[in-house]
Swiss-Prot record:
The record marks 164, 213 as: Could be important to modulate the pK values of the two catalytic cysteine residues. GO terms for molecular function: diaminopimelate epimerase activity. HAMAP family: DAP_epimerase (MF_00197). This is Diaminopimelate epimerase. It comes from Trichodesmium erythraeum (strain IMS101). Gene3D superfamilies: Diaminopimelate Epimerase, Chain A, domain 1 (3.10.310.10). Substrate binds at residues 13, 66, 76-77, 162, 195, 213-214, 223-224. It is found in: Cytoplasm. One of its GO terms (cellular component) is cytosol. The active site is at 75 (proton donor), 222 (proton acceptor). Pathway: Amino-acid biosynthesis; L-lysine biosynthesis via DAP pathway; DL-2,6-diaminopimelate from LL-2,6-diaminopimelate: step 1/1. InterPro entries: DAP_epimerase_AS, DAP_epimerase_DapF.
C-alpha cells in the first residue's frame, strides 16, 4: 500500500508529515520511521510526524517518531509544521488548533505573515517533572553544578513537556556537540535522557543557541529547547522574558508571559515537497 507524505521544516529542523486522520494509531512503525529519516537511503528527516484524530475534545493528536525510532512527548518546531500541514489538509479559513500531545494540549495559531505562534503552556521546574535526580533543596535545578565529560557545568533544568538541560557558555561555536552532546543525553541523572542546550548571551534580549536533541542528535533548531532556554535565562538572570533566540537554522521569538506564565513561541514552518512512500 502506498502512502503520501509532505516534508516540512522549521528553521531546518525537518520532518516527514503523514495524514493519519483515519485511525488513532500511527500507520508507520518506529522501524519504518528510522528508514525514512535516513538521509542517505531514505527521504531524510529529523522525525516523522503523524496527524491523528483529536481526543478529549481537541482538534488533532500529534505523534512523532524521532530519527532513532524513539517517541518524544512533543516537538516545538514540529508542531508549527503540523499546524501548516493541517491547514493545507483542511483548506479552510481556520487558523488555530487545539492539539493533543504527550506534553498536554498545545495551541498553534497561523499568522498572516506566514509565521506560526504556539501557546506552549507553562514550563515545569520541579526535578520530578523533568525528570532528573539532580535537585536543590527546593526540588528545582537552577544554576547547579554537574560533572559531564570530565568538566564541571552550571546547568538549569526545565521541562516543556520534554526534558531540557541548559548551560550558559562564552562561545557556542566552541562546543563540540558530537562529543559532549551524547554525554549529557545519557547522563544517569536523567532517567529518561535529556535534550541539551548550550546558550551564549549576546544581550538580555538576544541569545545564540546550539542544541543536542534526545533521539535526534545535533539539529539546526529546537523549539521546545528555545523555550526552555529563555526560562532558564530568566531564572539565572541572564536574559529578559521576551527574547530572540538565534539557532543555526534561523531565529525564534520566545516570550515567557508575566500575565499567564505561559511560553509563546513564534517562528516559521515551510513546506519542502510532497511524495509517495511505495
Amino acid at each position: 500500500m502506498t502512502k503520501s507524505f509532505t516534508k516540512y521544516h522549521g528553521l531546518g529542523n525537518d520532518f516527514i508529515l503523514i495524514d493519519n486522520r483515519h485511525q488513532l494509531q500511527p500507520i508507520l512503525t518506529p522501524e519504518q520511521a528510522i528508514e525514512l529519516c535516513d538521509r542517505n537511503f531514505g527521504i531524510g528527516a529529523d522525525g516523522v510526524i503523524f496527524a491523528l484524530p483529536g481526543v478529549k475534545q481537541t482538534d488533532y493528536t500529534m505523534r512523532i517518531f524521532n530519527s532513532d525510532g524513539s517517541e518524544p512527548e512533543m516537538c516545538g518546531n514540529g508542531i508549527r509544521c503540523l499546524a501548516k500541514f493541517i491547514a493545507e489538509l483542511e483548506n479552510n479559513n481556520k487558523t488555530k488548533y487545539n492539539i493533543h500531545t504527550g506534553a498536554g494540549i498545545i495551541v498553534p495559531e497561523l499568522q498572516g505573515d506566514g509565521q506560526v505562534t504556539v501557546d506552549m503552556g507553562q514550563p515545569r521546574l520541579l526535578a520530578s517533572e523533568i525528570p532528573t535526580t539532580l535537585a536543590n533543596a527546593d526540588d528545582k535545578v537552577v544554576d547547579q553544578l554537574l560533572e559531564v565529560g570530565g568538566k564541571s557545568w552550571f546547568v538549569t533544568c526545565v521541562s516543556m513537556g520534554n526534558p531540557h538541560c541548559i548551560t550558559f557558555v562564552e562561545d557556542v561555536t566552541a562546543i563540540d556537540l558530537a562529543k559532549i552532546g551524547p554525554k549529557f543525553e545519557h547522563n544517569p541523572v536523567f532517567p529518561e535522557r535529556t535534550n541539551t542546550e548550550f546558550i551564549q548571551v549576546i544581550s538580555p534580549k538576544y541569545v545564540k543557541m546550539r542544541v543536542w536533541e534526545r533521539g535526534a542528535g545535533a539539529t539546526l533548531a529546537c523549539g521546545t529547547g528555545a523555550c526552555a532556554s529563555v526560562v532558564a535565562g530568566v531564572l539565572t538572570q541572564n536574559n529578559e522574558r521576551l527574547v530572540t533566540v538565534e539557532l543555526p537554522g534561523g531565529c525564534l521569538e520566545i516570550e515567557w508571559s508575566t500575565i499567564d506564565q505561559k511560553i509563546y513561541m513564534t517562528g516559521p514552518a515551510e513546506k519542502v515537497f510532497t511524495g509517495i512512500i511505495a
